[in-house]
Every structure is written in structure tokens, then in C-alpha cells.
Amino acid sequence: MDGEVLANKSCCGAVVTAFSVIGIVFTILKFTSFASFVYKTFFAKGVKLSVYGAKKGYWAVVTGATDGIGKEYATQLAMSGFNVVLISRTQEKLDALAKELETVAKVKTRTIAIDYTKTTAETFEKLHQDLVGTPITVLINNVGQSHYMPTSFAETTVKEMDDIMHINCFGTLHTTKAVLSIMLRERQKNEKGPRCLILTMGSFAGLLPSPYLSTYAGSKAFLSNWSASLGEEVKKQGIDVWCFNSYLVVSAMSKVRRPTLTIPTPKKFVRAALSSIGLQRGGTNPYISQPYPSHAVMSWSLEQLLGSAKGFVVSQVAAMHLSIRKRALRKEARLQAQNQA
């Protein structure tokens, strides 16, 4: 009997010890994760743009370049010493921005007008031919479209659905395909030359289910996984790939006009983005980052702290989008009434 008691005590002691070790390891891992998050978000410095050939005659390609975040990428890259290929829909806007950058930043520019809702394989073959021979080291995949207003998938028009997928997915892949072959050729010619960068704009909608923006959310989730896959494929060839996710940014697409702690201006967001290349902020997924500090905090909190509560967050996102939809519908009704008066 005494032997059985001793055996039971020994077994219980082993179980307690095992759980204690597990608890200690879990605590250490959580603390390490938190410390890494704090360091990368608030203290670490990203890869310098000189690594990609800034001020050495190399070129950056920016899509969706004439408004909002895209315009800021083009402007800040030009001010950092890159010549810039500007791609957007409206030639008049392209010409105005090109003139501005040539005057202010003293760089070379090229403009290419592309309506990403109407592209074909021939569009991107022509783009590739137009860019062959240009020493491109940076591609910013910024062009994108969201829903006109939050709408259930059942009520989303076929045109809006197709445009979102055509621009965000088809357009981004084909633009990257056209530019990547040029980058690879440059790297093969000069392995000791600057590295190359492919940076694609993602969204929080791709991190977390976004009811009433379902098509847009799906397109951004696709870009996250595609970027991570591509990043692993080309890293040994001297090409860095990142998907930068943002929460809301003041822009025409977000329909937000005033900046807040969590909603930066395009200038602030892009400044944070270009200074945090190479830093995996706000999450654990490789090649994916939330470069703006408050966005990184939000993302890390969702990933590390909420766990099963993510379902509650999704329901709150749905409620927020429904509220936005109601306000948009009221505004439309008000404008319609004014026009009829």
C-alpha cells in the first residue's frame, strides 16, 4: 500500500513538474514575442533605400501613382533619389506629377497610362517591352480598388466584383511578372549590384474576415499569401518581397478625411513603410508586415491576445461596415433629393 501511495505521489509530482515546465516555456515564448514586437515596431531600423540603389540612377515603378498612398510612394522614392516610372489611369494626372517630381526631386520620370479595369495579356506584354532596358530595382504594387460602399456579397454587382479581382489580383500579378523578369536579368548581369524590392500593398481586410467587403477582403488575403510565397522563391536571387498591410489611411478609397492615432495621412504611412522594409512588424507571418506603429499594435494584439475572441472582432467589423453603409446610403439619398429640388 505504501508503495502505491509513493508511486501516486511520484506520478503527481511528475505531472506538476511537466505542467510547470510547460508554463515556464509558454511564458518565455510570450515574453520573447512581446519583446521582439516592441523592438521591431518602435526601435529597429529597416533596410536603407541605398541597398536598392537610391541616388545611383536606378528606377522605381509605382502603380496607382497619382493619388493617395501611391502618389506618396512616388514622391518619397523620388526624393530619396530614385528615377520613377509612374503608372496610373489618367495621362493628365501622370504628366502633372511627372513634371512636379522632375522639378522638385531633380530625377527622371516616365509615365505609362493603364486602366487596370480593362487590361489584357497584351497590355502587360507592352508594359514589359516598354520597360526592358530600364534598370529597375523597386516595384510598388499600389493600384487597388475596394467596394464603393460596404455591401453584402449577394448584393455586390458583378461589375464591381470583377473590377476588384481584375485590378487587385490579375493586375498586380501581371505587373509583377512584367517587372520581375527585368529585375532577374539585372541581378544576373550584376550580382554585386543593388538588391531589388517588390512591395505590395495589402490590407487588414486580408488579415481578418471583413463582412460586407468580402470580395475586397478575399483579394487582399490572396495578395498576402502570394507575396509570402514569391518572397521565399526569389530571396536567394537578391530580390526582397514584402506585403505591407494597412488599416484605414486618409484617402479617397477609404473615404476617411481626418487623420487620427490609428488613421495616418498617406505621407505618414509611406514614411513609416519606407523606413521599415525588412522588419516583420505586428505579426509572425513571413514577408508580411504592418509598418505603421499603431497598425502593428492592432495586428499583434489580434494575433497574440484575442485567440478565440476573433469571432467577436469579426462581428464588430461587420457592425462597423453596416454603419458605414447606412451613412453612405443616407448621403446618397440626401444628394439625390438636392438634385431633384
Swiss-Prot record:
Q: What class of enzyme is it?
A: oxidoreductase
- The UniProt transmembrane annotation reads 15-35
Species this protein is from: Schizosaccharomyces pombe (strain 972 / ATCC 24843) (Fission yeast)
* Membrane topology designation: Single-pass membrane protein
Q: Binding of NADP(+): at which residues?
A: V61, D115, N142, K177, Y216, K220, V249, S251
The record's listing under PANTHER family reads: HYDROXYSTEROID DEHYDROGENASE-LIKE PROTEIN 1, VERY-LONG-CHAIN 3-OXOOACYL-COA REDUCTASE
Its recorded reaction(s) are: a very-long-chain (3R)-3-hydroxyacyl-CoA + NADP(+) = a very-long-chain 3-oxoacyl-CoA + NADPH + H(+)
Q: Name one Pfam family in it.
A: adh_short
Single GO BP term: fatty acid elongation
GO CC terms of this entry = endoplasmic reticulum; endoplasmic reticulum membrane
What family does this belong to? Belongs to the short-chain dehydrogenases/reductases (SDR) family.
Q: Which HAMAP family match?
A: 3_ketoreductase (MF_03107)
Q: What EC number(s) does its UniProt record assign? A: 1.1.1.330
Compartments reported by the entry: Endoplasmic reticulum membrane
Primary role: Component of the microsomal membrane bound fatty acid elongation system, which produces the 26-carbon very long-chain fatty acids (VLCFA) from palmitate. Catalyzes the reduction of the 3-ketoacyl-CoA intermediate that is formed in each cycle of fatty acid elongation. VLCFAs serve as precursors for ceramide and sphingolipids.
Q: What is this protein called?
A: Very-long-chain 3-oxoacyl-CoA reductase
Q: What is a single molecular function from GO for this protein?
A: very-long-chain 3-oxoacyl-CoA reductase activity
Going by the UniProt record, its keywords in alphabetical order are: Endoplasmic reticulum, Fatty acid biosynthesis, Fatty acid metabolism, Lipid biosynthesis, Lipid metabolism, Membrane, NADP, Oxidoreductase, Transmembrane, Transmembrane helix
What pathway is this protein a component of? Lipid metabolism; fatty acid biosynthesis
Would the keyword Ubl conjugation turn up in this protein's UniProt record?
no
**Catalytic residues identified in the record:** Y216 (proton donor), K220 (lowers pka of active site tyr)
